[in-house]
Amino acid sequence: MRLVLAVGLVSLGGCASTGEERDPRDPLEGFNRGVYRFNEGFDDWIAKPVARTYRKALHQEIRSRVGNFFANVQDIFIGVNNFLQGKLEDGVNDWARFAFNSTFGLLGLHDVASDMGLEKHNEDFGQTFGRWGVPPGPYLILPFLGSSTVRDGAGTALDYYFAPLTEVRPIELRNTLFGLYLVNTRADLLDASQLLEEAALDKYTFQRDAFLQRRRSLIYDGNPPREKLE
């Protein structure tokens, strides 16, 4: 499960660009800005108030344990994606993290693996497609999920299809866990979204550029090749 969910909930709208300013990576900008405004409304009226109430109700230490639990579950398919990308040592590291945190860390509530020197990675199927040479395609804003690309959208579908939480039964428990994940993640991003509101003149453009730059960096593990200039 990817934090793209959280990024989507932080989406805030901006004014439309002129044709001269149109970014070639974003040919669907008109459509995207419409979805962006929808996400902004959902965030302002539902997601953000719920997250604020949640943060007031639970101490930061408890919220941290909740985040650790979900991060531990994610390590399973982070490892799978590292294997698919040919990074065998990192994949073994990820599965070792899951094993140690699930046992000695009490189902992942405590991140003992990091204390043991096992690094936390960030991988998903969208990054795997990128490593395989699949082009990103146009930038997209997805309803509720936020920033993506055609490639990452396909990756997101696989991320959720294979997410371990989808196998949890009964369905009521599964839905409760998904809801807890979303609210806890949004609560962690409240301060970041406030900074975005204060810093960016056109928040849509700021978020788009930051997202595309970050995804490119993640695909190449922080060392992307120099982009060719037209």
Q: Predicted regions span which residues?
A:
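Post-signal peptide N-terminal segment of mature Sec-exported envelope proteins
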Residues: 23-46
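A small/polar active-site loop signature that marks catalytic segments
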Residues: 64
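Mid-length scaffold segments of soluble, non-membrane domains
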Residues: 72-150
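A structured, mid-to-C-terminal "fold-capping" secondary-structure block
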Residues: 19-22, 127, 132-230
